[in-house]
């Protein structure tokens, strides 16, 4: 079972991590994208990434500091969004880290696919950014089916715990013979079921932690997830979407 996660816009620097890190599988592609972005002026960052001047300066400096001559930090500890705060990877044991690295894959506009303990640098680059790379007019076109092929090579189920922006990068390549399941988290508001962005990110993080801590490799075991009031709803779910509702 492969767990597919989104990255996070917010990132943090890790002072000390004393375990070996691996390099992302598409590091040569990453270098190509970085060299492209290093030509950007501040205005390019602002316009293409839809960010303010302060963030544009920060990210220009981040990209200019990427040298690839030294290791960065572990991906799962560097991403700092709501989902990652609820994974709580800083509390993982060595066995947790090994299990997480075997099944979690983070989809990234810059790196393509990263394992939790791959080395990454701090950056900001959303998959939906209209960034031309060579002959490709955006990152979806640039990555093409490479992300899908990397995930599916394990010949096992893919569990989608990512946002639409990132799941979109592989869904058009999914075949009928593939086992691809999206976990959707909804809240019951006066009898109306809604996906609330913040709650969904939090739940995806909790589900990821639940999978790691319980060493889950069978998709049927996902249905037992019941943290913070969520319950699997058989009547709302199907073979490609597991729906969990918080009453």
Swiss-Prot record:
Entry's transmembrane regions? none
A cellular-component GO term for this protein = cytosol
Which Pfam families does the annotation name? Answer: H2O2_YaaD
GO biological process per UniProt? response to hydroperoxide
Sorted alphabetically, which InterPro entries does this protein's record hold?
A: YaaA
PANTHER family for the chain: PEROXIDE STRESS RESISTANCE PROTEIN YAAA, PEROXIDE STRESS RESPONSE PROTEIN YAAA
Q: Which NCBIfam families match?
A: PRK02101.1-4 (NF002543)
Q: Which family does it belong to?
A: Belongs to the UPF0246 family.
Full protein name: UPF0246 protein CD630_18230
- What are the top taxonomic ranks of the organism? Bacteria, Bacillati, Bacillota, Clostridia, Peptostreptococcales
């Amino acid at each position: 079972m492969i767990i597919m996660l989104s990255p996070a816009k917010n990132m943090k620097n890790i002072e000390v991590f004393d375990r070996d890190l691996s390099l992302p599988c598409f590091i040569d592609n990453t270098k190509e994208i970085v060299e492209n972005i290093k030509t950007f002026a501040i205005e390019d960052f602002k316009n293409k990434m839809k960010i303010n001047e302060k963030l544009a300066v920060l990210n220009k400096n981040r990209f200019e500091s990427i040298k690839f001559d030294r290791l960065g930090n572990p991906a799962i500890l560097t991403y700092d969004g709501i989902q990652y705060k609820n994974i709580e990877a800083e509390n993982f044991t060595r066995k947790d880290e090994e299990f997480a690295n075997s099944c979690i894959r983070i989809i990234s506009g810059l790196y393509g696919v990263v394992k939790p303990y791959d080395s990454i640098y701090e950056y900001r680059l959303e998959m939906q950014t209209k960034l031309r790379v060579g002959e490709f007019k955006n990152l979806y076109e640039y990555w093409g089916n490479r992300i899908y092929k990397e995930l599916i090579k394990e010949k096992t189920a893919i569990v989608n715990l990512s946002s639409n922006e990132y799941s979109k990068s592989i869904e058009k390549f999914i075949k009928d013979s593939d086992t691809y399941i999206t976990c959707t988290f909804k809240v019951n508001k006066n009898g109306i079921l809604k996906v609330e962005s913040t709650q969904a990110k939090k739940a995806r993080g909790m589900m990821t932690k639940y999978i790691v801590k319980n060493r889950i490799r069978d998709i049927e075991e996902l249905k037992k997830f019941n943290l913070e009031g969520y319950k699997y709803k058989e009547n709302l779910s199907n073979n490609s979407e597991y729906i969990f509702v918080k009453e």
